[in-house]
Amino acid sequence: MSKQEKLSAIEHIKTASHGLRGTLKESLQDEITGAIREQDQALVKFHGMYLQDDRDLREERAAKKLDKLYSFMVRLRIPGGLMTPEQWITAHHVAGEYTTGVIKITTRQTIQLHGILKNHVKPTHQNFSKVKLDSIAACGDVNRNVACTSHPAESLLHKSIHAYADRISRLLLPKTRAFYEVWLDEEKIAENTETDPLYQDRYLPRKFKIGICIPPNNDVDVLANDLGLIAIIEDGKLKGFNIAVGGGLSTTHGNADTYARLATVIGFTDTEEKTLKAVYETLTIQRDYGNRSDRKLARMKYTLDNMGVDAFRKELEKRCGFPIEDPKPYEFTQR
């Protein structure tokens, strides 16, 4: 298990957050500033938001001894990027009513809305909730939005594979009701009744990204994800998924310990039950072995390299309770 002597500051904030609640309710009631408390700024990411300010106005406002012009960015959780017409119309309404008026489509198949003032954040979430949209775990040290190359309308096969994005997203959601209590005014039933077997009270050491693709198309860059599922198709039927672990292309300038890495294809699972179990337990390994001291070295790729691919696969098999088959042949010819 991970044995770093000194935990990073965010680790202490997470464990003391009471299930990602922190003092968010109190921060929202503070009308003196458009910001929220410093520790809440870390926690609000797990709710799918970032606190931002207008950099172009910093000097002007400082000269007038005014606070920065703070606002929030909200990123929705949309597994596989599929929205209904009603949901898109709601996003258009929210963008016009509460934001800069711009809807940004991200590379991970979701949307972001910027410029939301503090007193408009709750109405934003309440509008989205009416059409079954939320921003839970769209940011933060958790599984992020699940990307999938498949368009469900292309064929029944594509539809069945696209459904994995939603299943995985639901499987890996935090169990805390904090989002519903803070933004949707859900009443808290009792103290200390929540348990989260996956994230516990520490969550993950860093963000975790999952992509699903159907060869020969690789438009989600599946090997650039912390975990990738590569659909294996034979005679027009889904036989299972190759599992790729440890991808990530980001590096930190001037830090030679950081590096880009393509995911390693470590094995194959032939049933939905086994695939979902392997995905889940991959996260538990990252939770337990990931670096919680240095966030620059905390992604899955560093965990995999520190453990070694063979040791990682053995640990995954141990946690899953079944052997991981060897990878099946596949080929990418287009993106």
Which residues does each predicted region cover?
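Peripheral terminal and linker regions in Fe-S/redox and tRNA-modifying enzymes
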Residues: 1-335
